[in-house]
Regions:
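N-terminal glycine-rich FAD/FM-binding segment characteristic of electron-transfer flavoproteins
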Residues: 1-357
Length: 357
């Protein structure tokens, strides 16, 4: 909210945002700003060109179009930081106070945040037993993994549940069942129409999926309702009155337990579509020079391909292959990671897999 007040003071034609902030990784700033500024919004933009009446954009789905000012644009691809030029170092930095932007002090800082982190703890939810094998045992390990299949991870249910939980779209239903007695599914609509449905329906909580459309729509609706939104939740619980949300934090090394201070609490939850491929090979930056060989092996064993964010940001592989906290979630019987460090942000997208090699 305070950021929008500062931007209004500057009266820009376009506001450019990254995919997500460096502190929260939630991807809410751009969509929320668009609502508070009453600007148009385009998300997941890969390229921009000047056009007669504004800008022409292409997004990660290879769709494109024109957008005119004023607008908020979130950029999908990260850019390498450049050393500041000598000229920029001598430029004055303008500091705006709360008074300068006419901000309500009671809504600044932690006091104004609609969500609260109640506690954090070490993330050990994805620990598995590990066996070291020699390279000649690879095909054996794949065959064993296929025989074993995967055990579907079912979220733990709370003993006491909220009376009415809404899902925007059907993908969050399994999560909703763990915390809600009565589940209502509504179809995604415009941000204004969706917000109005929620405002008049008075649900105890609203859940969203982790698809691109939901991640753009949910922050807009949260801003319209002046309520909190917790992103990329991996678990939910309730005591029958309050919804508690769990999500990875600090690069995924810890899990944060979060509560909404406003009503209704909203959350996007990590959901996975049923995988067509029983085997998926994930390609990381460490294997960037061997993509052709890996693709040939994948074709030989009838496997799909996935990628880490660094591989897609570096233009080695297309964005639709990205798996992880800021990508999609996959759940094959066998996931083969090649050149991947195993950062928790990537693991978040493969935790429903059967055997990981």
């Amino acid at each position: 909210m305070q950021l929008s007040l500062a931007i209004k003071r500057l009266c820009p034609d376009f506001v450019f945002c990254g995919r997500q902030s460096v502190d929260g990784d939630t991807g809410q700033v751009g969509p929320s700003l668009a609502v508070r500024l009453e600007f148009s919004l385009v998300t997941n933009v890969m390229s921009l060109e000047s056009a007669e009446n504004g800008l022409f954009y292409t997004d990660r789905s290879e769709n494109g179009g024109n957008i005119s000012a004023p607008a908020v644009i979130t950029l999908e691809k990260s850019r390498r930081l450049r050393l500041p030029s000598i000229r920029s170092k001598i430029k004055p930095v303008e500091t705006l106070s709360a008074n300068d932007i006419n901000a309500d002090i009671s809504l600044c800082g932690l006091k104004g945040s609609p969500t609260r982190v109640l506690k954090t703890f070490e993330n050990d939810s994805d620990r598995r037993s590990c066996t070291f094998i020699s390279p000649d045992k690879l095909m054996w390990a794949i065959e064993e993994g296929l025989k074993k299949g995967r055990q579907k991870i079912k979220p733990a249910e709370s003993a006491n549940k909220l009376k009415n939980v809404w899902c925007v779209g059907s993908s969050p239903i399994e999560f909703a069942k763990t915390v809600g007695e009565n589940i209502t599914v509504i179809d995604p609509d415009t941000s204004e129409k969706t917000a109005e449905k929620i405002r008049t329906g008075h649900p105890d909580a609203v859940l969203w999926g982790s698809d691109i459309k939901s991640k753009a729509l949910a922050p807009q609706v949260a801003a319209l309702l002046n309520t909190g939104l917790c992103a990329d939740c991996t678990a939910l619980e309730t005591d029958g009155e309050t919804l508690y949300m769990y999500r990875p934090a600090c690069s995924g090394n810890i899990i944060a337990k979060i509560r909404c201070e406003t009503k209704p609490p909203m959350a996007t939850v990590r959901t996975a579509e049923e995988e067509q491929n029983k085997i998926i090979i994930g390609i990381g930056y460490g294997a960037r020079e061997h993509i052709a060989a890996i693709k040939a092996f994948a074709e030989k064993i009838n496997a799909g391909i996935a990628a880490t964010r660094k591989m897609t940001d570096g233009d080695y592989l297309p964005y639709e292959l990205q798996v992880g906290l800021t990508g999609k979630t996959v759940n094959p019987d066998v996931y083969i990671a090649v050149g991947i460090s195993g950062a928790v942000h990537h693991i978040a997208g493969i935790r429903q897999s059967g055997t990981a090699i």
